[in-house]
Amino acid sequence: MSQEKNISELSFEEALKKLEEIVRRLESGDTTLEDSIQMYSQGDALKKQCEARLKAAQKKIEQISLDQDGRATGTSPFDAE
């Protein structure tokens, strides 16, 4: 099974944890150049996976619309911008 397939099967939390570990190892400076390049590549794939999971979750979020008295009147799609 390829690295890309493994990453795509990770939950957001698992991918984020792996990404944080890679960042920690890269920041420590205790890796070879080849290992650093490989970890950077894996980290980039993990970052993209996390972003994709967040965007998918954001599309599912709805905002509750309130009237002037504060009563719920319905929902509308979440707009982050």
Swiss-Prot record:
It catalyses: Exonucleolytic cleavage in either 5'- to 3'- or 3'- to 5'-direction to yield nucleoside 5'-phosphates. The keyword Metal-binding does not apply. SUPFAM superfamilies: XseB-like. It holds the Pfam family Exonuc_VII_S. Keywords: Cytoplasm, Exonuclease, Hydrolase, Nuclease. Heterooligomer composed of large and small subunits. This is Exodeoxyribonuclease 7 small subunit. It comes from Zymomonas mobilis subsp. mobilis (strain ATCC 31821 / ZM4 / CP4).
